[in-house]
A protein has these predicted regions:
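Conserved ABC ATPase "signature" region
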Residues: 96, 100, 107-125, 176
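Conserved ABC ATPase signature
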Residues: 129-133
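Conserved catalytic loops of ABC-family nucleotide-binding domains
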Residues: 174-186
């Protein structure tokens, strides 16, 4: 997997959020560091095709991601800073619902949901309603939904926000394991 940002710029009126960025990423973990307003989330949103660049391009294995359309989005797992969920759904129901939206076959989804619930440490609360979860537990459910389709590119915007120190360690280990087979952008 190779993702390239080619002279990428994103402007909002007179404000330049991303300015002529050129870089190449392959499998592994990449962390974006910068002050608030530095363009990290904007860059992630462009990578996830939620924003179009003002100029420049983003390619995946040599193809423009905006031209790839659903072919590209099938390679992608995304956890935004703030994500929506149905508060009345249980963790398991929420993940099954998201799996169906991602086109994961029901038999595969059932197995994958069980596996991911365990991986992110939510087995004991799998049947609890989302509205009853702590902020850290909701975040872990969000991480699980991003991984449902076994993405080749995993984009996680502030993934450890709300996680306690032990969960941060578990998360770092999980990301290390996942990055062997995919590109992970934090």
């Amino acid at each position: 997997m190779e993702v390239k940002f080619n002279d990428l710029t994103k402007k909002f009126g007179n404000f330049t959020a991303v300015d002529h960025l050129t870089m190449t990423m392959t499998n592994g973990v990449y962390g974006l560091l910068g002050v608030n307003g530095a363009g990290k989330t904007t860059m992630m949103r462009m990578l996830c095709t939620l924003l179009k660049p003002t100029s420049g391009s983003i390619t995946c294995n040599g193809k423009d991601i905006f031209e790839m359309d659903s072919e590209y989005r099938n390679l992608l797992g995304y956890l935004p800073q703030d994500f929506g969920f149905y508060p009345e759904f249980t963790v398991q129901d929420y993940l099954m619902y998201i799996a169906s939206l991602k086109g994961v076959r029901p038999a595969v989804a059932k197995k994958r949901v069980k596996e991911l619930i365990s991986k992110v440490g939510l087995s004991k609360v799998a049947n609890r309603k989302m509205k009853k979860l702590s902020g850290g537990m909701k975040r872990r459910a969000g991480i699980a939904q991003a991984m449902l389709n076994n993405p080749a590119i995993l984009v996680l915007d502030e993934p450890t926000a709300g996680l306690d120190p032990n969960e941060r360690i578990r998360f770092r280990n999980l990301i290390s394991e996942l990055s062997e087979e995919r590109l992970v952008l934090l």
